[in-house]
From Swiss-Prot:
<keyword id="KW-0963">Cytoplasm</keyword>
<feature type="binding site">
    <location>
        <begin position="29"/>
        <end position="32"/>
    </location>
    <ligand>
        <name>ATP</name>
    </ligand>
</feature>
<dbReference type="Pfam" id="PF00118">
    <property type="entry name" value="Cpn60_TCP1"/>
</dbReference>
<dbReference type="InterPro" id="IPR027410">
    <property type="entry name" value="TCP-1-like_intermed_sf"/>
</dbReference>
<keyword id="KW-0067">ATP-binding</keyword>
<dbReference type="InterPro" id="IPR018370">
    <property type="entry name" value="Chaperonin_Cpn60_CS"/>
</dbReference>
<dbReference type="GO" id="GO:0140662">
    <property type="term" value="F:ATP-dependent protein folding chaperone"/>
</dbReference>
<feature type="binding site">
    <location>
        <begin position="86"/>
        <end position="90"/>
    </location>
    <ligand>
        <name>ATP</name>
    </ligand>
</feature>
<dbReference type="GO" id="GO:0051082">
    <property type="term" value="F:unfolded protein binding"/>
</dbReference>
<protein>
    <recommendedName>
        <fullName>Chaperonin GroEL</fullName>
        <ecNumber>5.6.1.7</ecNumber>
    </recommendedName>
</protein>
<feature type="binding site">
    <location>
        <position position="493"/>
    </location>
    <ligand>
        <name>ATP</name>
    </ligand>
</feature>
<dbReference type="GO" id="GO:0042026">
    <property type="term" value="P:protein refolding"/>
</dbReference>
<keyword id="KW-0547">Nucleotide-binding</keyword>
<comment type="subunit">
    <text>Forms a cylinder of 14 subunits composed of two heptameric rings stacked back-to-back. Interacts with the co-chaperonin GroES.</text>
</comment>
<dbReference type="GO" id="GO:0016853">
    <property type="term" value="F:isomerase activity"/>
</dbReference>
<dbReference type="GO" id="GO:0005737">
    <property type="term" value="C:cytoplasm"/>
</dbReference>
<keyword id="KW-0413">Isomerase</keyword>
Length: 539
């Protein structure tokens, strides 16, 4: 296919137009007085949201060069969402600011490679300073504050803090839609491990790409299943019992996989296969954990187990199982509670005896999976539109909370970025264009606070100057229009979110500046209807 080419300034300007279109759409949502964006959907009602990455994912521009710019910044939002789960709007805004400031200098003749070096140095310094002012999360109150700021709702903050308290920091928290009007918390015993389905054809919900099994039987084995004959006697019993099946095995392949998928597609019976979690000895222990939780038996060569001789009473049971591409959650395993308690105590004894940090971490994980359970936040609302919006906000708040527990918290409202400006500004370079890169970051660090003020209808520059001249940690509460100690006021951001947003924005933006040529497909001209095949005018 023929291509169209743009070079130098023209290429960068076209791409910058796309960056600005995406970033200007996203940044209106920043801060306590940020607005929402409404997204048209091909099916169902439009989606109203203030989640940066959700908005960015929907944006495709008609002009190929503008679209390239937009897609690059979309990557900033997506990467930040993957790493920290929140802060996507801030990341997009920072990327736009770095690109804008950088292009001014590149146009004036600065070397983009040297600018990139300066940006990298400044970002490393800024991250180091952000980590210095970070404070660990202490107790339920701090967790509630982080969640409340992320979701812009104190009730949600309290709900998530309750969930974290009930299942512990290692526990699993999921967000589901509720049939009632209110949002509530439900804690269910359960276990999650990071192995997904072996074939996408096994899903029961093609929109969410997940398989949900109600009251399934659970076959647990450390063998590889490739021959369907090994499973046939057991499958016949399961079909007669009218049950669904979850298979946890070393692997499922070949003829066995094909037969299971074909039967699922024909509707004969529903079966989902997942690979066993962990490796080596840890895999054996984790399979035993699952067996204890579900009341099943691990069918293993070590104890002379044979799949052909397996019976229904060797299978575990659970109230429900949810399998996604990456994880499996077993809820309310029907195992003997006494045996589960014994298993938990056994792991606790191992924890006390081990000296290896790695082993401790893995044992702690197993303990959480056996004892912690799964907390389910059920989101309710009057309409589907409101429900989707609330669900996205709660998911963001949950991610922010987990990030805060991992790396601590910093003053919110863009204050952390402004607080580190002085230290970053002290950096110097003998090479002029590297110094330009450092100065770009110094200016860009002001941008989140400026935008929060702008969204509250205020002049950002005045507020930034006042914060710069205040004590460290003092910022601007845009909701109440007051200057205060942000951490004491409960206006906090997770360190991980603040750090990731800056690192990802700088990574993509500095690479963007080094672009000297852009190549895109020439759009195909649409043929008028009825043309072609020499049939015009025929009736």
């Amino acid at each position: 296919m023929a291509k169209t080419l743009l070079f130098g300034e023209e290429a960068r300007r076209s791409m910058q137009a796309g960056v600005d279109k995406l970033a200007n759409t996203v940044k209106v949502t920043l801060g306590p007085k940020g607005r929402n964006v409404i997204l048209d959907k091909k099916f169902g009602s439009p989606l109203i949201t203030n989640d940066g990455v959700t908005i960015a994912r929907e944006i495709e521009l008609e002009d190929a060069y503008e679209n390239m710019g937009a897609q690059l910044v979309k990557e900033v939002a997506t990467k930040t969402n993957d790493v920290a789960g929140d802060g996507t709007t801030t990341a997009t805004l920072l990327a736009q600011a770095i690109i804008r400031e950088g292009l001014k200098n590149v146009t004036a003749g600065a070397n983009p490679i040297l600018i990139r070096n300066g940006i990298k140095t400044a970002v490393e310094k800024a991250v180091e300073e952000i980590q210095k002012i970070s404070k660990p999360v202490n107790g339920k109150e701090d967790i509630a504050r982080v969640a409340a700021i992320s979701a812009a709702d104190e009730k949600i903050g309290k709900l998530i803090a309750d969930a974290m308290e009930k299942v512990g920091n290692e526990g699993v928290i999921t967000v589901e839609e509720s049939k009632s009007m209110g949002t509530e918390l439900d804690v269910v015993e359960g276990m999650q491990f990071d192995r997904g389905y072996v074939s996408a054809y096994m899903v029961t919900d093609t929109e969410k790409m997940e398989a949900v099994l109600d009251n399934p039987l659970v076959l647990i084995t450390d063998k590889k299943i490739s021959n369907i004959q090994d499973l046939l006697p057991l499958l016949e019993q399961i079909v007669q019992a009218g049950k669904k099946l979850l298979i946890i095995a070393d692997d499922i392949e070949g003829e066995a996989m094909t037969t299971l998928v074909v039967n699922k597609l024909r509707g004969t019976f529903t079966c989902v296969g997942v690979k066993a979690p962990g490796f080596g000895d840890r895999r054996k222990e984790m399979l035993q954990d699952i067996a204890t939780l579900t009341g099943g038996v691990v069918i293993s060569d070590e104890v002379g187990g044979d799949l052909k001789e397996a019976t229904l009473d060797m299978l575990g049971e659970a109230e429900s199982v949810k399998v996604t591409k990456e994880s499996t959650t077993i809820v309310n395993g029907r195992g003997n509670s006494e045996e589960i308690k014994n298993r938990i105590n056994q792991i606790k004894l191992q924890l006390e005896a081990t000296t290896s940090e790695f082993d401790k971490e893995k044992l702690q994980e197993r303990l959480a999976k056996l004892a912690g359970g799964v907390a389910v936040v059920k989101v309710g609302a009057a309409t589907e539109t409101e429900l989707k919006e609330s669900k996205l906000r709660i998911e963001d708040a949950l991610a922010a909370t987990k990030a805060a527990v991992e790396e601590g918290i910093v003053p919110g409202g863009g204050t952390a970025y402004v607080n580190v400006i002085n230290e970053v500004a002290k950096l110097t370079s003998d090479i002029q264009d590297e110094q330009v890169g450092i100065n770009i970051i110094v200016r860009s660090l002001e941008e989140p606070m400026r935008q929060i003020a702008h969204n509250a209808g205020l002049e950002g520059s005045v507020i930034i100057e006042k914060v710069k001249n205040s004590d460290a940690g003092v910022g601007f509460d845009a909701l109440r229009g007051e200057y205060k100690d942000m951490i004491k006021a409960g206006i906090v951001d997770p360190t991980k979110v603040t750090r990731s947003a800056l690192q990802n924005a700088a990574s993509v933006a500095s690479t963007f500046l080094t672009t000297e040529a852009a190549v895109a497909d020439i759009p195909e001209k649409e043929m008028p209807q009825g043309a072609g095949m020499g049939m015009d005018g025929m009736y």
